[in-house]
């Protein structure tokens, strides 16, 4: 066996999206902030992103959380997120899963029925409250960073749809185009996954070609994520599907997307401080979102969101990187 690097991961799923948490094998990443660490990784170790996320070790839908040492006082660890096409600032599923892994494997000591874990991210420190039943973590609540509407009441011309109203919202650093499913001509149902992917990719192409999107802290930016959703019913349940990466559809309800949608509903007057939203994914599993407060981001009205979900550990892996392997850095065939 030959390998000049061994990377250990703990695998888990959060509401259906299978993920990995890198726990060792990278060494200490230089940088005073999570952004510094992610940029150093991107500049010097991006081949490990492709090597881990793409085949033969990964697949086109794989999202990976990378654990680092903390960068702020009181934090337990840091996280940034990699996927086949690049990097994410934040990820609810990944943060819920990483907190669950840290507690269930003993990396962070439990404090009783409820344990407070602080996670450093590029969007800022995230306070999590993990609730335990016996040996397992049954739910994790993220007390997250501000979310807001960047552009409201936009209209783009979408192939196969025509004129389509939409909004651009920011959920804890991730930027989303938010589209009403009925107006997009598709239902948010598991059996329509392929059509959701096609429609989402068409919306993303139209948004990036026709809109100028500027976000505080990011400047002019591309929109990589499309949320296709239905308005909450009488019980506050709102189905949604995230289209991301190379045309993938998230099985889970999307944590940062839930925050973006709550910011939009708050902007529309559909949610107030203290209101909750049940964000339902394509598998029928839920995140519960709550608006904990209001704030401002560079003069824009914003919300302080909370999201609660559950993760389950699924395995432990060690990945080898043979210097002689011609596919060491990964590959992805066009589907």
Which residues does each PLM region occupy?
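Active-site proximal loop and beta-alpha junction motif in alpha/beta enzyme cores
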Residues: 1-90, 97-335
